[in-house]
Amino acid sequence: KASSSAPKGWTHHGSRFTFHRGSM
């Protein structure tokens, strides 16, 4: 629902969660 509900490194995009790697 909210991006704050997603774990650290994950972003709520649309109706799915996408994992974003800051280092790589």
From Swiss-Prot:
Recorded GO MF terms: carbohydrate binding; toxin activity
Biased composition (Basic residues): 10-24
Predominant location category: secreted
Protein's cellular compartments: Secreted
Entry's Gene Ontology cellular component terms: extracellular region
Residue ranges occupied by any C-type lectin domain in the UniProt entry: 13-24
Keywords assigned by UniProt, alphabetized: Lectin, Myotoxin, Secreted, Toxin
Highest taxon above the source species: Eukaryota
Tissue-specific expression: Expressed by the venom gland.
Signal peptide from the UniProt entry: none
Region (Disordered): 1-24
Keyword S-adenosyl-L-methionine: no
Family designation: Belongs to the true venom lectin family.
Function noted in UniProt: Able to depolarize frog skeletal muscle fibers, but has no effects on squid giant axons. Tetrodotoxin is able to partially antagonize the depolarization. Induces myonecrosis.
Name of the protein in its database record: Myotoxin TmC4-47.2
